Design a protein with these regions (language model features):
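Short beta-strand-to-loop junctions in surface cap/lid or active-site-entrance loops
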Residues: 1-11
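Short beta-strand element of the alpha/beta-hydrolase
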Residues: 10-22
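Hydrophobic beta-strand anchors of alpha/beta hydrolase catalytic cores
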Residues: 15-17, 47, 166
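Serine-hydrolase catalytic-loop signature spanning alpha/beta hydrolases and amidase-signature enzymes
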Residues: 22-27, 47, 91
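Primarily recognizes the serine-hydrolase "nucleophile elbow" in alpha/beta-hydrolase
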Residues: 87-162
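The feature captures the conserved acid-bearing segment of alpha/beta-hydrolase catalytic domains
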Residues: 132-204
Length: 206
């Protein structure tokens, strides 16, 4: 999504979006997202709505008979989505000349499972996760916009280096993605927007 009336002389910022759907559904072309995309396009962004593998879609219930099994399946789903999001980011970077975009102004955004994906992508990037090696050395997003997101882990979020600016939107009564946390001791789980915000406050205070 972009405005054809934009000056071809100016490099454009990009927003890469990841859809929601519980890692078992969703659609990058969902009509519900189009007003958001068009708003950003009117404000000078190129918008790329990306796809990713939803590994919980065909999950065999017999393979998730315990909380540990479910957390492992969820972690695999998140890692897979992050891997695909990194690859989508790399694709956008590789197209930067043809699309006349500014690779230093790539913003990641997502909703629900997509928000988990983009937050986890930035979290893994800042913490030196192996998956982050799929991105060019020294790359970081210009910002993250999360709508009801979380990061996964055994412990509360801890950032090894300062992340990009992060904007969090999340209802505190959300029963799907936890606002606070949905983590089991020694097993891990999801740390919601409230926990992420606290970790960022602690990082700035240190």
């Amino acid at each position: 999504y972009e405005l054809t009336s934009m000056s071809p002389a100016s490099k454009k910022p990009v927003m890469i979006f990841a859809f929601g759907g519980g890692f078992k559904g969703g659609d990058k072309a969902d009509k519900g997202y189009i007003p958001y995309f068009e708003f950003l396009a009117r404000n000078g962004f190129v918008v790329v709505s990306t796809d990713y593998r939803t590994t919980l879609k065909n999950l065999d219930p017999s393979k998730v008979s315990s909380p540990m099994d479910f957390i492992a399946a969820l972690q695999h789903a998140i890692d897979t989505a992050v891997e695909d999001f990194y690859d989508a980011t790399g694709f956008v970077i590789n197209q930067s000349s043809d699309w006349n975009i500014d690779v230093e102004q790539i913003v990641a955004s997502g909703s629900s499972a997509g928000a988990i994906t983009v937050l986890q992508a930035e979290y893994d990037l800042c913490n030196g996760h192996e998956l982050a090696k799929r991105l060019p050395a020294g790359f970081n997003y210009a910002g993250v916009i999360s709508y009801a997101g979380a990061v996964s882990g055994v412990l509360p979020p801890h950032w090894e280096k300062m992340p990009c600016p992060i904007m969090l939107f999340h209802g505190d009564a959300d029963k799907t993605v936890p606002f606070e946390q949905a983590a089991m001791e020694n097993l891990g789980g999801l740390w919601g927007s409230s926990a992420v915000a606290k970790s960022l406050e602690n990082l700035q205070a240190s």
